[in-house]
Amino acid sequence: MGCVTSQEDKAAVERSKQIDKSLRMDGEKAAREVKLLLLGAGESGKSTIVKQMKIIHEKGYSQEECLQYNPVVYSNAIQSMIAIIKAMGQLKIQFGHPDRAEEARQFFALAGHADEGEMSQELSGIMKRLWKDVGVQECFSRSREYQLNDSAEYYLNALDRISAPGYIPTEQDVLRTRVKTTGIVETHFTFKDLHFKMFDVGGQRSERKKWIHCFEGVTAIIFIVAMSEYDLTLAEDQEMNRMMESMKLFDSICNNKWFTETSIILFLNKKDLFEEKIKKSPLTICFPEYTGANTYEEAAAYIQLQFENLNKKKDTKEIYSHFTCATDTNNVQFVFDAVTDVIIKNNLKDCGLF
């Protein structure tokens, strides 16, 4: 009888061990599954971060995939020139050369009939001459007074290259393309033994109602702010400062009851554009109370503090902040490596394994 009981006890102990082992394996598996939500206002750089994940953690863009971006590159370059020339009328800026006004009319006519995925030599020739005009350059230097794609200068400076026969976009060209994200774009990749699911959500106000069902079971939120937009207004609301809109959105995400346990990672993005802009456009445009110097270091630290101060649970919740340039692959790789280490540590802690 005692022998039978002993065998039953052994079996029960063995079963208990198996259950513990299974639970531990489930815990470890859960700790290796990471659901990342990319949030931020429109044009903050979320989609560029997703493209970088493909370059860094997958095989990058094949020649065929790069070729598919031809129409987007051409469209971005043409739309940038259209925006600048239209703004010249609004800002009452004259062309530096008398011939350019007629060429601007030709440009609009050619741009309106350009085949998608093609840029004729005639069109690119006119665009190159317009781009060199002192009036066009003056208008470009005042781009904070109207809506202009961040990549305008990059593409317009590269017109020789991008309009050449047989042009294939480089990965940097692809990274710089701008297409408004509508809906939710999901990306999967593996890094440091973790299985990532990254969700890029449209940032414009009209897209935000679609975020809600993505929130369940999120491991971390990467909130992206375009630092360089401190002196700009929203495309969808000309009265609203873009930085203020970002702060409002960050406040609602950071202090949301659903995200009490969620790691919040703050990417202060477009640091390269910010570093150039702060030399000529004071931070007081956005923060009238700012009394520091208009240097990159002081102004960037002030912006970081403004966002981190929105956190109402400083004693229990940490904001992990990083300065980023989403178009710089090395910078994104370095930052994402640090972010992943934080996620691993927090995941193991949540699963009782740390």
UniProtKB/Swiss-Prot annotation:
Residues 265-272 are annotated as: G4 motif. GO terms for cellular component: cytoplasm; heterotrimeric G-protein complex. Residues 324-329 are annotated as: G5 motif. SUPFAM superfamilies: P-loop containing nucleoside triphosphate hydrolases, Transducin (alpha subunit), insertion domain. Belongs to the G-alpha family. G(i/o/t/z) subfamily. This is Guanine nucleotide-binding protein G(i) subunit alpha. GTP binds at residues 40-47, 175-181, 200-204, 269-272, 326. Residues 173-181 are annotated as: G2 motif. Mg(2+) binds at residues 47, 181. InterPro entries: Gprotein_alpha_I, Gprotein_alpha_su, GproteinA_insert, P-loop_NTPase. Residues 35-48 are annotated as: G1 motif. Residues 32-354 form the G-alpha domain. The keyword Metal-binding applies. A lipid is attached at residue 2 (N-myristoyl glycine).
